[in-house]
Amino acid sequence: MLYELIRLRKENKLSQLKLGEMIGKKQRMISKYEREDVELPVSVAKRIAKVFDVDWWKLYE
């Protein structure tokens, strides 16, 4: 699981739906990224990182 993504999202009180809206992805895809059913592309990681003001590569830790 992408625990850092989950932690950041919850810490910032964002739902999967709201985060998805902010980066142009559906809630279903955010869920798949978090569960690692689908690999998180670097391009999407960079958009998520901008939302949370973190380095994109930290999402993979």
Where are these regions (language model features)?
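A short, Lys/Arg-rich alpha-helix, primarily the initiator
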Residues: 1-11
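Short alpha-helical DNA-recognition segment
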Residues: 13-32
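Short, Lys/Arg-enriched C-terminal cap helix and immediately downstream tail that follows
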Residues: 8, 42-43
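Residues within the helices of the helix-turn-helix
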Residues: 6, 17, 46
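DNA major-groove recognition helix of helix-turn-helix/homeodomain DNA-binding modules
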Residues: 43-58
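The alpha-helix within a helix-turn-helix
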Residues: 9, 20, 49
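Key DNA-contacting residues within the recognition helix of helix-turn-helix
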Residues: 6, 31-32, 60
